[in-house]
From Swiss-Prot:
Entry-linked HAMAP family: PanB
Family in the record: Belongs to the PanB family.
Catalytic residues as annotated in Swiss-Prot or TrEMBL: 188
Pfam families: Pantoate_transf
MF GO annotations: 3-methyl-2-oxobutanoate hydroxymethyltransferase activity; magnesium ion binding
Function of the protein: Catalyzes the reversible reaction in which hydroxymethyl group from 5,10-methylenetetrahydrofolate is transferred onto alpha-ketoisovalerate to form ketopantoate.
Residue positions binding 3-methyl-2-oxobutanoate: 51-52, 90, 119
This protein's name: 3-methyl-2-oxobutanoate hydroxymethyltransferase
Obligatory cofactor(s): Mg(2+)
Extent of the signal sequence: none
Alphabetized NCBIfam families for the sequence: panB (TIGR00222), PRK00311.1 (NF001452)
Coiled coil: none
Main location: cytoplasm
Amino acid sequence: MSYLQDDKPVTLFEIGKMRAEGRKISMLTCYDASFASLLERAGVDILLVGDSLGNVVQGQKSTLPVTLEHMIYHTECVVRGSTRPFIVTDMPFGAYHESPSQAMHNAASLLAAGAQMVKLEGGTFMAETVRFLVERGIPVCAHIGLTPQSVHQLGGYRVQGRSEAAAAQLKGDALALEQAGAALMVMEMVPAALAREVTASLASMATIGIGAGPDCDGQVLVLHDMIGVYPGKKARFVRNFMTGKTDIDEAVASYVQAVRDGSFPAAEHCY
């Protein structure tokens, strides 16, 4: 179960305390009330209402077609099914890129739907928007490394930060986003050694890895991936936690424990 008392909601303060005390943070994507309830029972700390629903729920080839209305609807569903986990919702493509004011308007809609934090993709160039939101009372989770909304610009789903220049850019991005007020940051498909350096360089912003090695402050996976419900080739960073389990509750509890004790991700899941 969770580090917290079963009936005690996970808050941003508690997440910061977990980071400070070296207790790993577990996050999974979630898109509906039934799974929200299941993930809560298994002790997941953070539910990410991810725009990955475009891939695993809608059958899209990318997250780009997902709309703000989709994210509001799925956030409302997740909120109805859970009471304890902290809820983070992705801002979809096009919902925050035009201006900080546009981001504020759309982030407010997501918080009204029940989200407790919004997540947006991008590095230093998004720092102004992050600061604008945080100064107006909207908690922000940043996302660097492989940013799926930029899949066409990046030339596909590739590991980021391999070159010296790219690594320096990611380090600079992380510091700029922390200084702008982001409280959490997802690092996706980043070499484990680089993710470790970035995490160590930050004063208080908690890092959540996906394909970013074991030294982040926490881990996240797409729910459908970690229970083996995915089409095509499995990504290197994915582990099927249903293997050897009799039900999904047991698989999710196993994921939470593996994140907590540091056995996931293992070397074979890292770059």
